[in-house]
C-alpha cells in the first residue's frame, strides 16, 4: 500500500483532531475509543498511531483545540460590541441556550470535560490543558466586568462562570424534562439582570 504524502498526512491528522474535539465534547474524554474517533474521521483505526502515541495524547490536543475554539468564539462576540454589558450578554445568552444544551459537540469544553477532570491526576498534561483553558475563558469573561475593583471582578467572574457551567451541565443532565429549560432560563435571567458594573 503506497504511503500518503506529508500534506495528506497533515490533513488526516487535522481531520482526526477535529473529529476527536467534537466527540470528546459529546461523550466525554473517556466515552470514546480510538476506533470511534477514526470512524468519525473517515479513516481506518490502524493509522491512528502514525499520528498520535496514545489516546491520551490525542485527548490533550483535542481538548486544547476545543478551548481554542471557545476562546476564539468569545473573542469574536466581545469584539462585535462597543460596551461591556452587550458583550457580556453575547456570551451568556448563547451559552445558556437550548442549542448549546442540545449540541455539546460544538459548545463549552468546561461543561463537557469537568466530570472527567475529577478523575485526572493533578499533574497530568490533560488536566494542565484544562486548567489553562479555564483560565483563558475566565480572563476573557472577567475583562467585561468593570466595578473598578479587580479582586471583586475576579470573584464575580468565578461565580458567574461557575453558574453558567453548572446550569449548562444540569440542563444537559435533565434534558427531556421541563426543568431543563427552567434551569437555562433561570440562570440566563439571573445573570443578564446583574449588569457588568454591579
Model-derived features: positions:
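Helix-turn-helix
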Residues: 15, 22-61
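Amphipathic alpha-helical packing segments from all-alpha helical-bundle domains
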Residues: 68-72, 76, 89, 104-107, ...
Amino acid at each position: 500500500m503506497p504511503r500518503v504524502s506529508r500534506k495528506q498526512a497533515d490533513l488526516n491528522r487535522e481531520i482526526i483532531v477535529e473529529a476527536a474535539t467534537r466527540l470528546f465534547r459529546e461523550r466525554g474524554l473517556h466515552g470514546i475509543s480510538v476506533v470511534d474517533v477514526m470512524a468519525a474521521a473517515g479513516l481506518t483505526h490502524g493509522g491512528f498511531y502514525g499520528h498520535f502515541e496514545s489516546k491520551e495524547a490525542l485527548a490533550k490536543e483535542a481538548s486544547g483545540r476545543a478551548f481554542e475554539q471557545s476562546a476564539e468564539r468569545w473573542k469574536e462576540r466581545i469584539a462585535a460590541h462597543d460596551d461591556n454589558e452587550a458583550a457580556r450578554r453575547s456570551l451568556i445568552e448563547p451559552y445558556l441556550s437550548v442549542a448549546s444544551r442540545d449540541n455539546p459537540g460544538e459548545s463549552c469544553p468546561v461543561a463537557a470535560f469537568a466530570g472527567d477532570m475529577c478523575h485526572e491526576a493533578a499533574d497530568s498534561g490533560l488536566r494542565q490543558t484544562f486548567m489553562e483553558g479555564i483560565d483563558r475563558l475566565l480572563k476573557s469573561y472577567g475583562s467585561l466586568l468593570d466595578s473598578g475593583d479587580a479582586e471583586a471582578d475576579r470573584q464575580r467572574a468565578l461565580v458567574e462562570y461557575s453558574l453558567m457551567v453548572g446550569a449548562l451541565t444540569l440542563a444537559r443532565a435533565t434534558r427531556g424534562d421541563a426543568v431543563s429549560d427552567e434551569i437555562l432560563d433561570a440562570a440566563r435571567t439571573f445573570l443578564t439582570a446583574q449588569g457588568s458594573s454591579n
